[in-house]
Amino acid sequence: MPRRTDLTSVLVIGSGPIVIGQAAEFDYSGTQACRVLREEGLRVILVNSNPATIMTDPEFADATYVEPITPEVVASIIAKERPDALLPTLGGQTALNTAIALHEAGVLAEYDVELIGANIEAIHLAEDRDQFKGVVERCGAESARSHIAHTIEEVLEAARDLGYPLVVRPSFTMGGLGSGIAYDEADLRRIAGAGLHYSPTTEVLLEESILGWKEYELELMRDRNDNVVVVCSIENVDPVGVHTGDSITVAPALTLTDREYQRLRDVGIAVIREVGVDTGGCNIQFAVHPDTGRVVVIEMNPRVSRSSALASKATGFPIAKIAARLAVGYTLDEIPNDITGSTPASFEPTLDYVVVKVPRFAFEKFPAADPLLTTTMKSVGEAMALGRNFTEALQKAMRSIDKAGSTFHWRGQAPDPERTAALVDAARTPTEGRLVQVQQAIRGGATLEELFEATAIDPWFLDQLFLLEEVAGRLAAVDALDAGVLALAKRHGFSDAQVAEIRDLGEATVREIRHAYGLRPVYKTVDTCAAEFEARTPYHYSSYDAETEVQPRDRPAVLILGSGPNRIGQGIEFDYSCVHAALALKGEYETVMVNCNPETVSTDYDTADRLYFEPLTFEDVLEVYHAELAVGPVAGIIVQLGGQTPLSLATRLADAGLPIWGTPPEAIDAAEDRGVFGEVLVAAGLPAPAFGTATSLAQARAVADRIGYPVLVRPSYVLGGRGMEIVYDVEQLTDYVRRATPTDGPADAPVFASPVLIDRFLDEAIEIDVDALYDGHELFLGGVMEHIEEAGIHSGDSACVLPPVTLSRREIERIRTSTEAIARGVGVRGLLNVQFALSSDVLYVLEANPRASRTVPFVAKATGVPLAKAASLLMAGATIADLRASGHLPAVDGTYAHPSSPVAVKEAVLPFKRFRTRAGTVVDTVLGPEMRSTGEVMGYDVDVPAAFAKSQAAAYGGLPTSGRVFVSVADRDKRSIVFPVARLVELGFEILATTGTADVLRRYGIDSRVVRKASDGRGPDGELTVVDLITAGEIDMVVNTPNGQGARADGYDIRTATTAADKPIVTTTQQFAAAVLGIEAIRRGPFAVASLQEHDAARAARETEGVHA
């Protein structure tokens, strides 16, 4: 059946901001879908609040709405655009839940909009735990014994039948949010309480414990003719109990017998048919008892999921693209396989390699969080690797994680028996580093039986780790490194650095020996069919195998180094810039993407001309360069777009003779080295906050005394404010050094392993961010962003406004001339990000980064200027004048905005509700100089209040328009809150406050109701504390600023209760003032919606009138 002719326009809902459990994989899925639907001649309308996505680039849809994904806003877009159909299966749980809400509100029926890709009945059957249990029974399969509950009373009743431990799973949530394993009644009350709260249907499933069972997933697709394909089987290395997003996973499943696999396949096909998914894909999770082989079906996602992205990249089978075609009427046998060009999508992929995915965590950003891995997903990113065997793929994936301690190591002596026993004991608890603990225990002599008993990891996987230990033993035992043993190590994934560690040699020496033996990796191709048909798409992975499959080429190649796994501080924003470079340089150059993140658009096989799915280490990049050099000229390597990961390789790559494009490595070092950068600022006459560099505690104290407290301390060469703190006195400085600074040298006089930077902290300064382009002669200023929060909160966590609202024309001119002086002094070619602080009319330079920043996509969306594309063309040799002439850049840059320009607000999205302390409470929500946000949204409207209100709706579900607001602020903030509180009273809000804040408000004539602090306990007549009121849902918004660095217990209790209750929490006075303006904007009426294309047309109209935009 060809495409349906009754559909002319489709609304696609994206997934919104990057959050734990719903990340960049949905940008990849949505981008593919939008591309396909437009190829089919359909008008595509897209709504997504995340400006850092490729899918929100105006060329991917006919009407692109960067608006909050709420039922009310999407209903406004439907009323305006009148689409024929709504496709909700490519935007994660957010899109699915929004579609259900629109259906239940009657909006889809009112505007005659058909749901495609999934029907409401199928969504309910798959997502509603009780109904899905019935589906499984009708298919002749088993679920775990379970009960459904809607209240805590029902939960406790179910526990009496099921016993402990038991698993709590809420309906209609993603990433395991609100789920957990309860070992007793106290656990159960806490976990089930959260689960009922987070489930939109206030429903949880309580099921018998299947902890320790083996966990598998099948990725399936079905069309309207009932053709079903199993795209991929995935096996979790960790047993049931760890969320699949937090487990190391393997494709294809390796420890199933053929009979077991066929059983899972039969059940999976029966379930997809019974649920009724007939125009798309789904993911089904299974548990298998390791001894009896009993199979239970855990759950199903009736949509494109995180696993779909992994399965797509693992097999080369583009699930999202095919799902979009199925949704508009095609059948699987009518859709061609892009990679072979000669087989249809109804041919199931076959793998002749092994794929391993390893998650990346960010517990270091949340020191109070419990590092235990459970059924609630906590990882912030992932890396994937391909190899000819499991050990090769595993070791490549572990080094792709790009984090200290994430790889197997053989440093020093093997652990003694006592330490080995401790390692085995520690491995009983699933944590981020469990596999490394197992490997170290094997070094110390632990047996396979001991480790299986401790971890319940399948013996086959454990045996593979013993195999690695054998290879390491052979490496250590030989007198000299011969070709045979070195080739054996490389076939098992050992890096040159690991071999060097085992042999006590330098990494460069090992590389020289390896090259002398002619030992280099070859590059195989992902072809979906185990070499049965010829592959037309160059999607490569390395292996120490026989023959390479890299084809000769005529055009010069450009290597673009991606950003690796998402992490806090280096996320999808950097992938965005890499994709833009690939798109801009295609044609004149052969674009070659090197990356290892399966979630992203950059690792789609048709983004660049060639894709190498490889770790971003010096060794791996060097080998890709050599492979490409062997088949044609290489013009250059781009390192400035992928964040700190590729940037940190720049100097070593240049020293090895590789042609680095754009800003040279010595200029990158000049911006990072405080001494050299200080000289650039002095030469340009630009002030910076007083600073110093220390390599010991004594030096650190002397520097802090000289420049005066408070000071900002941090290690050098970090991204995302890693390890950065504001320190108020010498005791805190000493504590910081002991906690956060690795040291070398003798115990009585330790020396820091790398210098610590100490800056004077500017209190009450306005922080400003600038993104600009420089070609060596001319500056193009992309945009000036003014932060809503004052300096001291990491720029990645602060809300910011473009164009700036309180900066004068004179101040903006100073910002422009200062940016140009820095670009010239450092020697930038390409992108530059500068952060300034304006304090007492002095413009201080905080830092400069000669690379793509995380604000580049936001500036591009707000101004319509593709900065990353322009930067890549500058690196290729163009000038800013050339780019203006070719239309890549407008005639006038973004220094000054037209008075009628709309306002864009970027808001950070923080993952606090995912992280709980060991006591079970949410971690503290206070912001500081270390970045903690996982993603961002954009609010776009005619003025700041409306844009800010949209940003809050997009990030956190919105601001209240009536009800109760609780206010308790530090003494220094009490004067600042008077006017915003007075305005809330005028708007009809009831104000609750603690005694101190209430006294100040009373003196200003503002009535408030005094409530008890948590530390006061309940009153003599049972009066509730503020935490009780928040938990009971009786407070609609909380304003609480932290009280210096002293005792924070009350504030902590208030903030964590607010986060757990899912209510808006404001922790700075500037944010409070903006929130009050936002509340007023909401009360004036529903949000107006406008597409980026409409904004671009208005901007063009202003320019043709002779007034710059």
UniProtKB/Swiss-Prot annotation:
<dbReference type="Pfam" id="PF02787">
    <property type="entry name" value="CPSase_L_D3"/>
</dbReference>
<keyword id="KW-0547">Nucleotide-binding</keyword>
<comment type="pathway">
    <text>Amino-acid biosynthesis; L-arginine biosynthesis; carbamoyl phosphate from bicarbonate: step 1/1.</text>
</comment>
<feature type="binding site">
    <location>
        <position position="847"/>
    </location>
    <ligand>
        <name>ATP 2</name>
    </ligand>
</feature>
<feature type="region of interest" description="Carboxyphosphate synthetic domain">
    <location>
        <begin position="1"/>
        <end position="402"/>
    </location>
</feature>
<feature type="binding site">
    <location>
        <position position="243"/>
    </location>
    <ligand>
        <name>ATP 1</name>
    </ligand>
</feature>
<dbReference type="InterPro" id="IPR013815">
    <property type="entry name" value="ATP_grasp_subdomain_1"/>
</dbReference>
<dbReference type="GO" id="GO:0004087">
    <property type="term" value="F:carbamoyl-phosphate synthase (ammonia) activity"/>
</dbReference>
<feature type="binding site">
    <location>
        <position position="835"/>
    </location>
    <ligand>
        <name>Mn(2+) 3</name>
    </ligand>
</feature>
<feature type="binding site">
    <location>
        <position position="169"/>
    </location>
    <ligand>
        <name>ATP 1</name>
    </ligand>
</feature>
<dbReference type="GO" id="GO:0004088">
    <property type="term" value="F:carbamoyl-phosphate synthase (glutamine-hydrolyzing) activity"/>
</dbReference>
<keyword id="KW-0055">Arginine biosynthesis</keyword>
<feature type="region of interest" description="Carbamoyl phosphate synthetic domain">
    <location>
        <begin position="549"/>
        <end position="956"/>
    </location>
</feature>
<dbReference type="InterPro" id="IPR036897">
    <property type="entry name" value="CarbamoylP_synth_lsu_oligo_sf"/>
</dbReference>
<feature type="binding site">
    <location>
        <position position="301"/>
    </location>
    <ligand>
        <name>Mg(2+) 2</name>
    </ligand>
</feature>
<feature type="binding site">
    <location>
        <position position="767"/>
    </location>
    <ligand>
        <name>ATP 2</name>
    </ligand>
</feature>
<protein>
    <recommendedName>
        <fullName>Carbamoyl phosphate synthase large chain</fullName>
        <ecNumber>6.3.4.16</ecNumber>
        <ecNumber>6.3.5.5</ecNumber>
    </recommendedName>
</protein>
<feature type="binding site">
    <location>
        <position position="285"/>
    </location>
    <ligand>
        <name>ATP 1</name>
    </ligand>
</feature>
<dbReference type="InterPro" id="IPR005483">
    <property type="entry name" value="CbamoylP_synth_lsu_CPSase_dom"/>
</dbReference>
<keyword id="KW-0028">Amino-acid biosynthesis</keyword>
<keyword id="KW-0665">Pyrimidine biosynthesis</keyword>
<dbReference type="GO" id="GO:0006526">
    <property type="term" value="P:L-arginine biosynthetic process"/>
</dbReference>
<keyword id="KW-0677">Repeat</keyword>
<feature type="binding site">
    <location>
        <position position="835"/>
    </location>
    <ligand>
        <name>Mg(2+) 3</name>
    </ligand>
</feature>
<comment type="function">
    <text>Large subunit of the glutamine-dependent carbamoyl phosphate synthetase (CPSase). CPSase catalyzes the formation of carbamoyl phosphate from the ammonia moiety of glutamine, carbonate, and phosphate donated by ATP, constituting the first step of 2 biosynthetic pathways, one leading to arginine and/or urea and the other to pyrimidine nucleotides.</text>
</comment>
<feature type="region of interest" description="Oligomerization domain">
    <location>
        <begin position="403"/>
        <end position="548"/>
    </location>
</feature>
<feature type="binding site">
    <location>
        <position position="847"/>
    </location>
    <ligand>
        <name>Mn(2+) 4</name>
    </ligand>
</feature>
<dbReference type="GO" id="GO:0005524">
    <property type="term" value="F:ATP binding"/>
</dbReference>
<feature type="binding site">
    <location>
        <position position="795"/>
    </location>
    <ligand>
        <name>ATP 2</name>
    </ligand>
</feature>
<comment type="pathway">
    <text>Pyrimidine metabolism; UMP biosynthesis via de novo pathway; (S)-dihydroorotate from bicarbonate: step 1/3.</text>
</comment>
<feature type="binding site">
    <location>
        <position position="299"/>
    </location>
    <ligand>
        <name>Mn(2+) 2</name>
    </ligand>
</feature>
<dbReference type="InterPro" id="IPR011761">
    <property type="entry name" value="ATP-grasp"/>
</dbReference>
<feature type="binding site">
    <location>
        <position position="301"/>
    </location>
    <ligand>
        <name>Mn(2+) 2</name>
    </ligand>
</feature>
<feature type="binding site">
    <location>
        <position position="792"/>
    </location>
    <ligand>
        <name>ATP 2</name>
    </ligand>
</feature>
<keyword id="KW-0460">Magnesium</keyword>
<feature type="binding site">
    <location>
        <position position="835"/>
    </location>
    <ligand>
        <name>ATP 2</name>
    </ligand>
</feature>
<keyword id="KW-0436">Ligase</keyword>
<feature type="binding site">
    <location>
        <position position="299"/>
    </location>
    <ligand>
        <name>Mg(2+) 2</name>
    </ligand>
</feature>
<comment type="similarity">
    <text>Belongs to the CarB family.</text>
</comment>
<dbReference type="InterPro" id="IPR005479">
    <property type="entry name" value="CbamoylP_synth_lsu-like_ATP-bd"/>
</dbReference>
<dbReference type="InterPro" id="IPR016185">
    <property type="entry name" value="PreATP-grasp_dom_sf"/>
</dbReference>
<feature type="binding site">
    <location>
        <position position="299"/>
    </location>
    <ligand>
        <name>Mn(2+) 1</name>
    </ligand>
</feature>
